[in-house]
Swiss-Prot record:
Gene3D superfamilies: 3.30.1320.10. GO terms for cellular component: cytoplasm; small ribosomal subunit. One of its GO terms (biological process) is translation. HAMAP family: Ribosomal_bS16 (MF_00385). InterPro entries: Ribosomal_bS16, Ribosomal_bS16_CS, Ribosomal_bS16_dom_sf. The keyword Protein biosynthesis does not apply. Signal peptide: none annotated. Pfam families: Ribosomal_S16. Keywords: Ribonucleoprotein, Ribosomal protein. PROSITE patterns: RIBOSOMAL_S16. This is Small ribosomal subunit protein bS16. It comes from the Bacteria. The gene is rpsP.
């Protein structure tokens, strides 16, 4: 099953997440099909907190991909801001 979820990157105590399309059987930070955005929970000042390619996310959801709870919340916030 294809899913859209967060993959953790960054340093210890400084998380940075990539929003990726991946097979649900792959490891959290393992192989992915496509990167569709990022989420920086500790962005400050002029740093961009979230960037999502909503067109590609809609494409994958149309093909049957499931979306994780956290990514769904990020999509909802991005749609509200746009």
């Amino acid at each position: 099953m294809v899913t859209i979820r967060l993959a953790r990157h960054g340093a210890k105590k400084r998380p940075f997440y990539q929003v990726v399309v991946t097979d649900s059987r792959n490891a959290r930070n393992g192989r992915f099909i496509e990167r569709v955005g990022f989420f920086n929970p500790i962005a400050s000042g002029a740093e961009e907190e979230t960037r999502l390619d909503l067109d590609r996310i809609a494409h994958w959801v149309g093909l049957g991909a499931t979306v994780s709870d956290r990514v769904a919340a990020l999509i909802k916030a991005a749609n509200k801001a746009a």
